[in-house]
Structure formats: C-alpha cells, structure tokens
Amino acid sequence: MNSYNKQIGNIGEAVAENYLIQNGYIILDRNFSCRVGEIDIIGKDGDIISFLEVKSRYGNLYGSPGESVNFAKQYKIYKTAQLYILKKKLNRFYFRFDVIEIIFNNYNDDYSIRLIKDAFQL
C-alpha cells in the first residue's frame, strides 16, 4: 500500500472511530493484528461485539468502498475475530461483522459515511 492510500486509511479510521463513539459504541480495540490478518476497529454496540472493516476513498469512481471487502478479506477478518474472541474470552457475547464506508469529497473536507451492520456472515 502506498503512503497516500495509507494516509487516507488512517484518516478514515479516525473518522469512523469518532462516528462510532457518537453513536454509542464502546471502542474495545483498534488495528488488532495477528498472523492471520488485521481488524480495523473492534467495538461494543450494546451487547454485541462488532468487528469493523473501514474502507475509505476519495470519490466513488471505482464503486463503493465496501465492494472491496471480497470473500478472501472476509475470511481473514473472520479468522482474526475468532482469535480475538479466544484471546479476550468473549465467547459469551454475540458478534457481527460490519463495514464502514467513508467517501471523501475531492474539493473540501466534507465526507459521507455509511455503516453497514451485518455486512457479511461466514
């Protein structure tokens, strides 16, 4: 990943985290990684543990950001989530996989954000 894309990703994750907090989430972890993969944000939404993939981009020219969360990426998130659940002893909770799409406007600091709850299941 080039540094420009990484910068957009970091800004997107910060925007997503603020959005989640404003909407009542408790942030449990950020950028949890293991040998299998990485999860951008792990939050608690009521009594549900939410594993969130944040996808950010400028404009919508190449489709919605969430479209890039293909089956291979979903599987890595799922396997990483399993390890997180075991490590943190969270097996008593329900959990789901969400995607947050952030599209930045090319002309100013404005952006649109969309939270897709239960974006995928495995």
Curated annotation (Swiss-Prot):
List, alphabetically, the HAMAP family matched. UPF0102
Q: What GO terms are given for molecular function?
A: nucleic acid binding
Question: Which species expresses this protein natively?
Answer: Clostridium tetani (strain Massachusetts / E88)
Q: Which family does it belong to?
A: Belongs to the UPF0102 family.
Chain segments annotated as coiled-coil in the UniProt record: none
> Which domain of life does the protein's organism represent?
Bacteria
The record ties this protein, via InterPro entries, to:
Restrct_endonuc-II-like, tRNA_endonuc-like_dom_sf, UPF0102_YraN-like
Full protein name: UPF0102 protein CTC_01256
Gene3D superfamilies from the UniProt entry: 3.40.1350.10
